[in-house]
Amino acid sequence: MLAMPDKAIAAAIQAAFNQFRQSAATLAPEIYAQETTANQSAIETWWANASNVVTVGVGYPLQQVKPPIVAVTIEAEQEMDRARFIGSQSGLVVPGAAGTGSYGYATQLRGRYSIACLGVNQDWVLWMEVLTRWALLSQRRNLQQPPPAGALLYRQTLSAAGFAPVPNSMADSVYPFARVLVLEADRLDTWSGSVADTVAGASVSVEVGAGS
């Protein structure tokens, strides 16, 4: 099936955040080690409040949202022209009666996905960037799974860009800072072709001697 990698990445980050919240006392020291910020106490208090919601979505929101927020977007995807699976016929599926099947195909893509961490100050952004990096690394195996649980993302590499201003659509929002993580990965995508043309129940009638 055609995978939606941005949705799978967002779901994986959200799952890791849920795991972090359930074991924050254990995981926070391990993830952050000695890294602290001027707003560390306020940040930890925020996470300790179960009613506070972490927004993880696909694309940038167009309205103000309470912090923190993580926005996942597909930056680029390119079919690998020398990959093994380009337009290959991976099998013939024949459901039901003979002659009613459809062909299955697969291709390999190289994708680049942006994960933006937004916050009201640099401390919040740094905190969310470290937590999101941990989330992506801890969910790496799950993202390799086939849809709908994962997105068949292989050879994942993670990098971080510098602090950046928010996009134009966020100009009036409460987020003056953003830190972008970039996830690059190979992705295997599969799909089914059209049902093959078939002829069923055809009959031919021959009248001997006609026209002689």
Predicted regions and their residues:
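Extracytoplasmic
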Residues: 67-69, 110, 178
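Glycine-rich, often proline-containing surface loops adjacent to acidic residues and nearby aromatics
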Residues: 105-119
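Acidic-leaning, charged glycine-interspersed low-complexity segments
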Residues: 123-192
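A contiguous catalytic/ligand-binding core that recognizes phosphate-bearing ligands
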Residues: 91-95, 99, 116
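A generic structural micro-feature
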Residues: 64, 105-107, 171-177
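Acidic, Ser/Thr- and Gly-enriched intrinsically disordered low-complexity segments
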Residues: 7, 62-69, 73, 77, ...
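Short beta-strand/turn micro-motifs at beta-sheet edges
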Residues: 96-105, 170
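Small/polar-rich, solvent-exposed N-terminal microdomains that initiate assembly or binding
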Residues: 1-93, 196-200, 205-212
